[in-house]
Amino acid sequence: IIWPMRNLGRLIVEMSTGLVSYQRVTKLIAEEREPLDEGDVQPAGAPQGHIRFDHVAFAYEPPPEVNSNEEAADAPVETLSDHRVFDGLAFDFEPGPEIDTHGDMAGAPDGAALAEPASPTPHVLRDISFECRPGQVIALMGGAGSGKTSLVNLLPRFYDATAGLITLDGQPLNSYTRRYLRQNIGIVEQEPFLFSRSIRDNITYGVGRVVPDEEVHAAARAAAIHDGILSFPEGYSTMVGEKGVTLSGGQKQRVAIARTLLKNPRILLLDDATSSVDSETEAEIHQALQGLMENRTTFVIAHRIQSVMDADLILVLKDGRVLQHGTHDELMAQPGFYRQIYDLQARMEDELQREIAGSNE
């Protein structure tokens, strides 16, 4: 009788989990689609890419009803890379004076408009201010829950800021239509999503026009995946399976880069695009990304300092605030969180090299 009772307990758990999932799916289906063409500004051409954050704060809207099971399902999942790099760094953060990375905020809204309004949920971003000029690279670093992804998700208007002001080329970001922003912003995620279609279909997905083979091949060459595709028996007609299961992690990343190149966006969001691949593949992807980032305003989320050393501005986030900011050389010249991360990663790299050398002897 013991085993039937245990199976009954497991069945109850599975049914409860399934019921919660069903409720959340039905809520999602019932949601109204956000208006894509709501906005006063829709320029004929691409944006220049001049982005400015002025005392920006953001908090997620709480769900209308949350029970204990849904709370558990909504708990944030922290990645291994977050723990590997940032855990164990003893650095107490005391909120100090306001950090302004672009000097005087001429034309900013009145102080009342910049104050964080009362919110039923805690703010995940607080008093974020910086400026990114066209073609510059902004790097974001910080541990799990520091607000890196939340910050970049404001740019395509997946969410709107709770307080403060974000401008694109001098116009408030929320005055642009979501369709215009998303047509001109390219995203390469840590785990790119590929559809169960051919490689060619995945590269051309979202372009919105008929794309000749020459353009597809040129994008694949720039992403360093063309030769790999031709090695498959069916070439660009190769079916990749759901989520690209037939491709390696590096191949999926390069297909996503080719897709973004074909879209030719003015603004790029790179969400830790090389954290889940080996060192050799990382070097190949990094080379492809350099071509993708050229003359484009780029935001890079990264955990490895080697990936952000050449950035025009590095923002170190902690608990939704800018803890440090500056170039790599400027941050290395001052004690702080960034220097601790650098020293830790350098020790890890030295230990790895010694292990490799020892195994080869």
Give residue spans per PLM region.
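Extended non-transmembrane interhelical loops and adjacent amphipathic helices
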Residues: L19-A30, H50-D54, M332
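Active-site phosphate-binding and catalytic loops of NTP-dependent enzymes
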Residues: E34-D37
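ABC-type nucleotide-binding domain
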Residues: G45-E361
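Two-component histidine kinase transmitter core
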Residues: E31-E32, Y159
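Cytosolic ends of transmembrane helices, especially the final helix of ABC transmembrane type-1 domains
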Residues: I1-L28
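Short, solvent-exposed loop/turn elements at beta->coil junctions and helix N-caps
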Residues: G39-P43
